[in-house]
């Protein structure tokens, strides 16, 4: 599988290789975070009335959460990666 990359806003990059998600420039992360699907927890908040959405991903074995705040349009572009990550998490459990 090729690495997928999605630029979110003007400062956040999300990459996915089918096993590991990597987030650079997230709101609640220092630098970048790499999390393998086998130990990941994912939460997606759909856009609110103002069009603001959010996703968070963390290693289930620690409490450091990586939070990405984004627009509804960015969420739509990121949706294929998040759906694949959710499927990989479900398969790993």
Mark where each language-model region is.
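Acidic, Ser/Thr- and proline-rich intrinsically disordered linker/docking segments
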Residues: 1-10, 27-93
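Polybasic phosphoinositide-binding surfaces of eukaryotic membrane-targeting domains
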Residues: 9-24
